[in-house]
């Protein structure tokens, strides 16, 4: 921050307490590494992420219902310059890439407005052992949002 900008910030009361954090440089969300699960009735979803290495995190998810495979997905998080890119290859569908629109120390949101559904995907850490993953896009009556509250689990299960 140059002297003129710092002086203006001080006059306007935008000191350290009100400073914004520079989000132009995305980082891989290392806090996502490990295994996560969601259990809702007969439905069980599990998502696994490798720790960041070589500028990439690899992930996979599997959802079963009544013990039968319902869907699976291969996932990739990588940096493209200063942008976090989330690439998903869902079972039976073409690969889709989403680019970061917001990245913080505890969350990230990626978007692809040209994709049918979802058009936005987000993850928000809630403490050491839980997170909310969500997808969002056009629905019958406006924006449709689905949230997936997940808890950390032992990867060996």
Mark where each language-model region is.
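Edge beta-strand at a domain terminus
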Residues: 95, 100, 105, 130-157
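Bacterial N-terminal signal peptides that target proteins for export
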Residues: 1-7
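Well-ordered alpha/beta subsegment
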Residues: 106-112, 116-125, 132-136
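Central antiparallel beta-sheet cores of small beta-barrel/beta-sandwich binding domains
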Residues: 23, 33, 38-114
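Bacterial Sec-dependent signal peptides at the C-terminal "C-region" and cleavage site
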Residues: 8-26
């Amino acid at each position: 921050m140059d002297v003129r900008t710092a002086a203006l910030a001080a006059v306007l009361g935008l000191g350290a307490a009100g400073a914004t954090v520079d989000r132009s440089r995305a980082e891989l969300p290392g806090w996502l590494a490990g295994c996560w699960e969601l259990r809702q009735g007969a439905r069980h979803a599990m998502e696994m992420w490798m720790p960041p290495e070589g500028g990439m995190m690899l992930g996979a998810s599997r959802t079963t219902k009544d013990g039968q495979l319902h869907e699976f997905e291969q996932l990739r998080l990588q940096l493209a310059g200063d942008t976090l890119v989330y690439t998903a290859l869902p079972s039976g569908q073409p690969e889709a890439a989403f680019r970061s629109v917001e990245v913080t120390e505890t969350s990230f949101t990626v978007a692809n407005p040209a994709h049918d559904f979802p058009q936005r995907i987000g993850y928000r850490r809630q403490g050491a052992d839980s997170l909310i993953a969500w997808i969002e896009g056009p629905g019958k009556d406006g924006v449709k949002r689905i949230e997936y509250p997940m808890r950390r689990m032992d990867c060996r299960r």
